[in-house]
Design a protein with these regions (language model features):
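Alpha-helical transmembrane segments in inner-membrane proteins
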Residues: 2-358
């Protein structure tokens, strides 16, 4: 005779997962409407839907269409993509390092991107003068340099940590810490050599912002982050096996070295594109995956897509707070994520310490 309680026990996790993903989808929608509707010109959700459905063709909606389609909608979409990319990267790094307190910055993307951006901000115009070229530098050079700097830094760490075809995540972690310190020192030298305008630009870049978001930025960021979001769930099975250890995962048929390379590459692309689009934003990649582990467990095939949803919603919500706290001015979004993320990180660290003590 079949045990009905067995079927119910199997169904309960599925119901929980469906409820969590439905809740996250609703959260993303609600936060997006909030972001598009709140600002110097408040716009009701009904008018937002009218503008989106009519594409700005109705003259009565001309002002709202201008605000929504040209300013707030690209900003919201960019925030969703960058937040999703950072959170998914954090989940990948935590799975790869088998440490729930790991962060995407461990592979050097943020350090390399930040240093490259600082070089362009401080030295870009001087290099043009030195070579007798007309200036100023096009703005597109800055995010392009940040993206390339992040990829180069990650490639350097990968080469340092790889010997005889095997990549040591411990070596990569230590090399990443060294790279972060070196990058910080070199950025400090650039800050010392900068003028007032460059110093403001450096400060704003290092703390992150979604200000100035355009459809051009969205179009440049989407081809980098969206393929990563599509690809990462396929790494879920391998990351689940990697929790047992590299040798055990290999004996289970997981191509461990290929998995490491894929995870590092995807993190480099997603974080590099995010830093290029919005500057350096911390704690999203750390807090979101760890929080979701408490809600839906460590199964990466669920954790990775859930991280994308919650990461996007969290960053857009932080952007809303950054716009409102000192309106009509705007806080760098990195300040908001740090103010929220740092206490949460300490709480997670203390909770983990208590668990290990038990």
């Amino acid at each position: 005779v079949a045990d009905p309680s067995h079927g119910e026990s199997l169904a309960d996790p599925r119901r929980r997962d469906v409820a969590v993903f439905a809740g996250l989808a609703v959260l993303v929608l609600a936060v997006s409407l909030l972001s598009v509707g709140i600002g110097a010109i408040p716009i009701a959700p009904s008018r937002i839907l009218d503008v989106l459905m009519q594409g700005g063709a109705d003259p009565a909606l001309a002002r709202d269409s201008l605000v929504i389609l040209n300013i707030r909608l690209p900003r919201t979409l960019l925030g969703l993509m960058v937040g999703a990319g950072l959170a998914v990267s954090g989940a990948l790094m935590q799975g790869l390092f088998r440490n729930p307190l790991a962060d995407p910055a461990l592979v050097g993307v943020s350090a390399g991107a930040g240093l490259a951006a600082a070089c362009i901000i401080v030295l870009g115009d001087r290099l043009l003068v030195a070579f007798g070229l007309p200036g100023p530098l096009p703005y597109a050079v800055l995010p392009a340099a940040a993206f390339c700097g992040g990829l180069v830094a990650t490639l350097g760490l990968y080469l340092v940590a790889t010997r005889s075809g095997r990549t040591s995540v411990a070596t990569m972690l230590l090399a990443g810490i060294a790279l972060g310190a070196l990058s910080g020192a070199m950025t400090g030298l650039l800050v010392y050599a900068s003028d007032d305008r460059q110093l403001r630009d450096l400060t704003f870049w290092s703390l992150g912002s979604l200000g100035g978001s355009t459809w051009t930025k969205v179009a440049a960021t989407a081809p980098a982050i969206l393929p990563v979001l599509i690809a990462v769930p396929f790494l879920g099975r391998g990351l689940n096996a990697l929790v047992l250890g590299e040798a055990e995962a290999f004996h289970l048929g997981i191509p461990v070295e290929r998995l490491k390379r894929a995870a590092i590459l995807l993190v480099a692309i997603a974080v590099g594109a995010g830093v290029a689009a919005a500057g350096v934003i911390g704690f999203v990649g750390l807090v979101v995956p760890h929080t979701l582990r408490l809600m839906i467990g460590p199964e990466h095939r669920r954790l990775l897509p859930a991280s994308a949803l919650l990461g996007g919603a969290l960053l857009v919500l932080a952007d809303v707070a950054a716009r409102l706290v000192v309106a009509p001015a705007e806080l760098p979004i990195g300040i908001v994520t740090a103010l929220v993320g740092a206490p949460v990180f300490l709480w997670l660290l203390l909770a983990r310490t208590r668990t290990l003590d038990v």
